[in-house]
Amino acid sequence: MVTIRLQRGGAKKRPFYQVVVSDSRCARDGRFIERVGFFNPVASGSAETLNLDLARIEHWVATGAAVSDRVAKLIKDATKAA
């Protein structure tokens, strides 16, 4: 099953998440199919907190990809801000 979920990066105590499309059997930070955005929860100043390619996300959902709970909230925030 294909899933749209967060992939953790960044440094210790400074998380940075890539929003990726991956096979649900792959590890959290493992192989992925496509990167569709990022989420920076500790952005400061004028740094961008959230950037999603909503067109690609809609494409993957239309093909049957499941969306994780946190990514669903991020998509809702991104559509409200756009």
UniProtKB/Swiss-Prot annotation:
Record has Ribosomal protein as a keyword: yes
Taxonomy, superkingdom: Bacteria
InterPro entries assigned to the protein according to its UniProt record, in alphabetical order: Ribosomal_bS16, Ribosomal_bS16_dom_sf
Entry-linked PANTHER family: 30S RIBOSOMAL PROTEIN S16, SMALL RIBOSOMAL SUBUNIT PROTEIN BS16M
Origin species: Aeromonas salmonicida (strain A449)
Taxonomic lineage: Bacteria, Pseudomonadati, Pseudomonadota, Gammaproteobacteria, Aeromonadales
GO cellular component, one term: cytoplasm
Biological process per Gene Ontology, one example term: translation
Keyword Ribonucleoprotein: yes
UniProt keyword list: Ribonucleoprotein, Ribosomal protein
NCBIfam families tied to this protein: S16
Protein name per the record: Small ribosomal subunit protein bS16
Family: Belongs to the bacterial ribosomal protein bS16 family.
Entry GO MF terms: structural constituent of ribosome
